[in-house]
Amino acid sequence: MATVSMRDMLKAGVHFGHQTRYWNPKMKPFIFGARNRVHIINLEKTVPMFNEALAELAKVGEKKGKVLFVGTKRAASEAVKEAAIASNQFYVNNRWLGGMLTNYKTVRQSIKRLKELEIQSQDGTFDKLTKKEALMRTREMEKLEKSLGGIKDMGGLPDALFVIDADHEHIAIKEANNLGIPVYAVVDTNSNPDGVDYIIPGNDDAIRAVQLYLNAAASAVTEGRNKDVAVVAEKDGFVEAE
């Protein structure tokens, strides 16, 4: 079972919050104190909260649920994509387009267009076009891939959101709240924890910390999915034994 220890978190700098003047008072229960005008997050709270979140993510994986990893700022972007791909899940790592969840019908149309363009680029259609027209379609395809590439095979709304930086991704969280989709989020000392179902109090800027959260989340989802496979195999075994 994927778990993270206090030592792992200390090494990754999870305990370093933001400068005290930027704090959100709603994060007070998760703050240990301050050092050099920087808030220190209480890892005694973070460790069990994160491990509880991982256990729940494993359950989502076991039910073959879809997890959407969200992190669009530079420190998280690449790691978000890697975690989603490693766990066979989905991601938004460039820009959250308003309505990505709440207006999914429109998003679905854009995904359809992206897939059409991908086929055209491979089946020789682009070669039959004028250079200008081919270039325009290539640019359109690249633009759509950048914003929707991580969700083009999601095939519907996700069952959970795993968010890096609740403050930066507040629109995504609000949309998930409106649709009743559970939100797992890393919440730093400057962020509002409201609307987050599974709060992970921690540093949302340090790349090592961001990778720690994402690697653990990806492992939990994968373990859950594999557990389901093992159970099915076991059941099949019993059937054969009869």
Swiss-Prot record:
Q: Which PROSITE patterns does the annotation name? A: RIBOSOMAL_S2_1, RIBOSOMAL_S2_2
CDD domains per record: RPS2
**Does the UniProt entry include the keyword Ribosomal protein?**
yes
Give the GO biological process terms: translation
A GO term from the CC aspect: cytosolic small ribosomal subunit
Q: Where are the transmembrane segments?
A: none
The UniProt keyword set, sorted, is: Ribonucleoprotein, Ribosomal protein
Q: Which InterPro entries match?
A: Ribosomal_uS2, Ribosomal_uS2_bac/mit/plastid, Ribosomal_uS2_CS, Ribosomal_uS2_flav_dom_sf
Q: Which HAMAP family match?
A: Ribosomal_uS2_B
Q: What is this protein called?
A: Small ribosomal subunit protein uS2
| Organism in which the protein naturally occurs | Vibrio parahaemolyticus serotype O3:K6 (strain RIMD 2210633)
